[in-house]
C-alpha cells in the first residue's frame, strides 16, 4: 500500500444484532451507515471471549476493546489472568496478598474485601471474591468482612440478589460476613462526583446507611422501592443496633476489582487525600488492590502489576515520525488515550489529544446526543487541514445510552452517530484519508430481554468493519479487534512489528 493517512472511527456499543426486536440499531434510521454495506468492503470482527484475551463466552468491554484495537494482538485481560492464577495457586501465594493477610493476622485486625459482586467480568468476578475468602480461611483469619457493591450495569438490573445469595452460601463453608451493600453508582463513580462517593465512604467508614439484618433483605427492599442494583443506597448490616464492621484506622483492606478506573476514587478518599468539604478523611490502612489503579498512589499494594505492552499502534507511529490525534468525549477519553496506547498515560511524540466534555446529566438517556456533535465539529477541521497522519475517534453514544436500557433514547443515540459519522467520512474522502469504521463491542444491538425487560449489558455479537477509501475496493476477511492495527499499518505502508501478532485483514 502507498503512504495513506487513516482514521479509525469507533462507534462504541454498535454491534450486529441477531434479534431484530431487541436491536435498537436495526430500528433506528441510519441511512448513512446502512448505505456503506453496498458501497465499501466490509466484514465483521469478534469482540469477546478468547479472541480478545477474555474467558470463552465473556462479553467484551471498552477497556478490553481499545487495548486490543491499539495493540494489534490478543491482549490477555486481567479477568483471564486472575482465573488462571486461582487455578494454578499463584494467587494464594501472591506476595502482596499474603502480606495483607499476615498483617491482619499478626496485628489482630479486621480484613475488609471491597468490590463489585457479580459475574459481569468487566470490573470484577464473584469467583475471585470467593477465592479470596477461601485463601483467608486457609490462613486462619476469622475477622473478614465484605463490602459488596451491587452491579446491574454489566449484568441484569435485578441480578444482585442472586449474587448475594450465591456469596452467602459460599461463605457458609468459607470465611467472612457481608458488612455493607452499596450500588456501584455511588461506590464506583469515575467522574469526580464526590457527593456520590461520600455515600459509599460514609457507609464503609462510619456505618452510615439503612440498617438491615442481612444483605439480601437490603436488596429485596430496594427492589420493592423499584430501585435496581446499580442505584442501591448504602445498607449496613447491624447486630444489636451496631454495624457488624466498619473500616477503621489500621485495618487491612483488599479491593478486588481488577478494572482500574472505577475503584480509583473510593481508594483515593480512603487512602490518599482528605476532602474536608465532603467530610472525607484518609485513613492509615494496609490497603491492597487487585491491579494498579493509579501509579501515583502512595502506600497502596498491588497484587497483579501491569505487563507493559510495547509496539502499540501509537508507538509505531511515533517511531515512524507520524502525527496522530486521539479524540473522544469525557466518558471514552481514557479509552482512546490510555487504553489504546496499551496502558500508557503520556502522549507519544507527535500525538495530540482532544476532548469534548460529556454532558452533566444523571443518566445519558436524558441527552442521547451526548457530545457527538461537538466532537464532530472539533475533528472535521483537523481532517480538512490534513493535520494528522492517523486519527482515533470514539463516539460513545450507542454504548453509554445503551447502558440505560431506554429504547427510544438508544435509537436517538444511534441516529446521532450515523449523522456524525457521515460528516467525518465525507471530510475524510475529500482529503485523502482511508476510514476504518468499526466498534469495540456491542450494546445497543440487544436492549430487550425475551420477557421485554431492559438489557443494559454489552453483547457477544460481532461488530461491523468498513474500510472506506476513495479507490480501494479489495477483499476484507473477518477477524478480531487485534487485527485492526496491523491492517492500518499495512494501508499506511509502515512495517508491522513482530509484537503485533494480529492478522492483516486485506490481501
Locate the predicted segments by residue.
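Feature captures the catalytic ectodomains and active-site-proximal regions of enzymes
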Residues: 1-507
Amino acid at each position: 500500500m502507498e503512504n495513506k493517512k487513516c482514521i479509525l472511527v469507533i462507534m462504541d456499543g454498535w454491534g450486529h444484532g441477531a434479534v431484530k426486536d431487541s436491536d435498537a440499531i436495526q430500528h433506528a434510521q441510519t441511512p448513512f451507515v446502512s448505505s456503506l454495506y453496498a458501497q465499501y468492503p466490509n466484514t465483521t470482527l469478534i469482540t469477546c471471549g478468547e479472541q480478545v484475551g477474555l474467558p470463552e463466552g465473556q462479553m467484551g468491554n471498552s477497556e478490553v476493546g481499545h487495548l486490543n484495537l491499539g495493540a494489534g494482538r490478543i491482549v490477555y485481560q486481567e479477568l483471564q489472568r486472575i482465573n488462571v492464577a486461582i487455578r494454578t495457586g499463584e494467587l494464594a501465594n501472591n506476595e502482596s496478598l499474603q502480606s495483607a493477610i499476615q498483617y491482619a493476622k499478626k496485628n489482630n485486625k479486621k480484613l475488609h474485601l471491597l468490590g463489585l459482586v457479580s459475574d459481569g467480568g468487566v470490573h470484577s468476578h464473584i469467583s475471585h471474591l470467593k477465592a479470596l475468602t477461601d485463601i483467608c480461611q486457609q490462613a486462619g483469619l476469622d475477622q473478614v468482612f465484605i463490602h459488596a457493591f451491587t452491579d446491574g450495569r454489566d449484568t441484569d438490573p435485578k441480578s444482585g440478589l442472586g449474587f448475594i445469595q450465591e456469596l452467602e452460601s459460599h461463605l457458609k463453608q468459607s470465611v467472612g460476613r457481608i458488612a455493607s451493600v452499596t450500588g456501584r453508582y455511588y461506590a464506583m463513580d469515575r467522574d469526580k462526583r464526590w457527593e456520590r462517593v461520600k455515600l459509599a465512604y460514609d457507609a464503609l467508614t462510619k456505618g452510615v446507611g439503612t440498617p438491615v439484618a442481612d444483605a439480601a433483605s437490603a436488596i429485596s427492599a430496594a427492589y420493592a422501592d423499584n430501585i435496581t442494583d446499580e442505584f442501591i443506597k448504602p445498607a449496613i448490616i447491624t447486630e444489636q443496633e451496631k454495624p457488624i464492621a466498619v473500616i477503621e484506622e489500621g485495618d487491612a483492606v483488599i479491593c478486588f476489582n481488577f478494572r482500574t478506573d472505577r475503584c480509583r476514587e473510593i481508594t483515593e478518599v480512603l487512602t490518599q487525600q482528605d476532602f474536608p468539604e465532603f467530610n472525607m478523611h484518609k485513613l492509615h490502612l494496609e490497603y491492597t488492590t487487585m491491579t494498579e489503579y493509579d501509579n501515583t498512589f502512595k502506600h497502596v499494594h498491588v497484587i497483579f502489576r501491569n505487563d507493559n505492552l510495547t509496539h502499540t499502534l501509537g508507538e509505531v507511529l511515533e517511531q515512524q515520525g507520524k502525527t496522530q490525534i486521539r479524540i473522544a468525549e469525557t466518558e471514552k477519553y481514557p479509552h482512546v488515550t490510555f487504553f489504546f496506547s496499551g496502558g500508557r498515560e503520556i502522549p507519544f511524540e507527535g500525538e495530540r489529544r482532544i476532548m469534548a466534555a460529556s454532558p452533566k446529566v444523571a443518566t445519558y438517556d436524558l441527552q442521547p446526543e451526548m457530545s457527538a456533535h461537538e466532537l464532530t465539529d472539533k475533528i472535521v477541521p483537523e481532517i480538512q487541514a490534513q493535520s494528522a497522519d492517523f486519527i482515533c475517534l470514539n463516539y460513545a453514544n450507542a454504548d453509554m445510552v445503551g447502558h440505560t436500557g431506554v429504547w427510544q433514547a438508544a435509537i436517538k443515540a444511534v441516529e446521532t452517530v450515523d449523522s456524525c459519522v457521515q460528516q467525518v467520512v465525507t471530510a475524510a474522502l475529500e482529503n485523502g484519508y482511508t476510514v476504518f469504521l468499526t466498534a469495540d463491542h456491542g450494546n445497543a444491538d440487544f436492549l430487550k430481554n425475551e420477557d421485554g425487560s431492559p438489557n443494559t449489558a454489552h453483547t457477544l455479537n460481532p461488530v461491523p468493519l468498513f474500510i472506506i477509501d476513495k479507490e480501494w475496493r479489495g477483499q476484507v476477511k473477518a477477524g478480531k479487534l487485534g487485527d485492526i492495527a496491523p491492517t492500518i499499518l499495512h494501508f499506511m505502508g509502515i512495517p508491522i512489528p513482530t509484537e503485533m501478532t494480529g492478522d492483516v485483514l486485506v490481501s
